Amino acid sequence: MVDFEELLSKTQEVEKKKIDEELKKAFTEANLIVDEAYNEILSEYSKRIQEIISKNIEALRGEEAKLEVETKRAVNKEKDYWVQQVFQKTLDELEKIANTKDYKNRIESILSRELTEGAIVYCSNNDKKFIEGILTTKRINNVSVEVDNSIKGGVKIYYPDKKLTRDFTLKTILNQIFEDLRDDVARILFGE
């Protein structure tokens, strides 16, 4: 027969094995629970992080678009400034054109073609005597000549009976030409 101590020892071993197996099962289950909880938390926070990243990306894209528009506005404003400077410089040079023989011939041609009795010719102070000379030479009577300090060259002809003004000033002609050539001027200035 087996003595008591041996029986006790065997019983302890069997119980120890059972306890070890149950501990292993419990440890495995605990690991599964921890892994599931970890994965759940990881998934939840990953979603939140993705949402935050998406919102930030959208906000950045909005800011980028806004900055692009502001940059284009600033660039266009600067380009317009420089194109306007070219226009102004050209406008300042108009007085030199008014001293050429071609200019004088064209003014004479305009006056011969456009003047009617009772008309008023507006011109620069520099052109007044020249225009009065044309009127005398061409024997165009009953036309008055008045100085308009805003005119640098060319003439405006006012027909009081028709309440009509025809503008042949160099500034008006330059405006028309410049609008047609504005894109070309910008291309030359900015290489576009």
From Swiss-Prot:
UniProt record similarity statement: Belongs to the V-ATPase E subunit family.
Main location: membrane
Organism lineage: Archaea, Thermoproteota, Thermoprotei, Sulfolobales, Sulfolobaceae
GO terms, molecular function: ATP binding; proton-transporting ATP synthase activity, rotational mechanism; proton-transporting ATPase activity, rotational mechanism
RNA-binding in keyword set: no
Localization terms from the record: Cell membrane
Function according to Swiss-Prot or TrEMBL: Component of the A-type ATP synthase that produces ATP from ADP in the presence of a proton gradient across the membrane.
Alphabetical GO biological process terms: proton motive force-driven plasma membrane ATP synthesis
Assembly and oligomerization: Has multiple subunits with at least A(3), B(3), C, D, E, F, H, I and proteolipid K(x).
Protein name, UniProt field: A-type ATP synthase subunit E
Organism of this sequence: Sulfolobus acidocaldarius (strain ATCC 33909 / DSM 639 / JCM 8929 / NBRC 15157 / NCIMB 11770)
Key words of the record: ATP synthesis, Cell membrane, Hydrogen ion transport, Ion transport, Membrane, Transport
Membrane topology, as annotated: Peripheral membrane protein
KW Transmembrane (keyword) present: no
One GO CC annotation: proton-transporting two-sector ATPase complex, catalytic domain
InterPro entries membership: ATPase_E_C (IPR038495), ATPase_V1_Esu (IPR002842)
SUPFAM superfamilies cross-referenced by the UniProt entry: V-type ATPase subunit E-like (SSF160527)
Domain of life: Archaea
